[in-house]
Amino acid sequence: MIAGSKLLMLGLFGALAVHALPEPAKAQVTAAPKLEERATSCTFSGSAGASSASKSKTACATIVLSAVAVPSGTTLDLTGLNDGTTVIFEGETTFGYKEWSGPLVSVSGTDITVKGASGATLNGDGSRWWDGKGSNGGKTKPKFFYAHKMFSSTISDIHIVNSPVQVFSINGATDLTLSGITVDNRDGDTDEGGHNTDAFDVGSSTGITITGATVYNQDDCLAVNSGTDITFTGGLCSGGHGLSIGSVGGRSNNDVANVIIENSQIQDSTNGVRIKTVYEATGSVKNVTYKDITLSGITKYGIVIEQDYENGSPTGTPTDGVPITDLTLDGVKGTVASSGTNVYILCAEGACSDWTWDGVSVSGGKTSSACENVPSSASC
């Protein structure tokens, strides 16, 4: 009997325990929202737009810059954006005047999309700084657009007018594509106008693609100073110094490799195809291809390759510290003014090798008698 009572009491206790204790609460787990749900689309405009955008940039999945007036001496700072951020320029973006080095705009981040809406312009109003000296003296002029440390990103349909000096600085970037970019500095085509208005300066970057660019300027359309796996295709370059490698040497990174420049036109420019390396510097230029390049209205050199640059000017004495190897020119054709030179090659002994030239035809100018150490496959 006692044993039976014990069993009955245990059974009742167990039943009470089951009913007395509540079920454990289920963990409240909220799925991470998608980026477009986590952040908002933010629009900034007017004179306070630049500051507000810079302060709020990490809270917005899409940043719309509508007719922003960037104050003088101020960078439109879009560095450190959240992954996947989209930046859209609308209307006319303007910049206040001050003598300073810039940049006027700076963007960095991963999986970033920067684009211009239809009709949008970034107006540097460079005439306020222009004095014909560029970055070599006179007024201190701000560089325009830093695309530094941009990874797996795109910049498209940006229309830049009248940059004070250099336009795009691409540095420390990987897998960056720029498409449909327009740089229009034609207002600077005067003696006291724009100078050193390079459109695209590339350094220490990998996997850079520039496609469909239209450039009117007074310096290099493209200048690759260092980097690998760089492509420039479908471009129109007018009024400047051509499509250039270099100058290579004298920087922290002095190696250029795997560059393709193709299907592009160079017109009304000082030079067409240009490669320049620095006197007594070290580095390398290898596996560079110029393919299907059309030249017209070239005033100085149709093709110029020199290993003698010092302080931005040729010395006439080439050195071998930056060899140029595996260079291909395929289908480079066009005309040079009668006062210009068709082809000029100045290599140090043994420093230019493994070149392939096919379908190269540049005429109208003079034949140089000052070429040195020209590889057998090329002609000067």
From Swiss-Prot:
Its EC number is 3.2.1.15. The keyword Glycoprotein applies. SUPFAM superfamilies: Pectin lyase-like. The keyword Secreted applies. Residues 21-38 form a propeptide. Disulfide bonds join 42-60, 221-237, 347-352, 371-380. GO terms for biological process: cell wall organization; pectin catabolic process. It is an enzyme of class 3 (hydrolase). It catalyses: (1,4-alpha-D-galacturonosyl)n+m + H2O = (1,4-alpha-D-galacturonosyl)n + (1,4-alpha-D-galacturonosyl)m. GO terms for molecular function: polygalacturonase activity. GO terms for cellular component: extracellular region. This is Polygalacturonase 2. It comes from Penicillium olsonii.
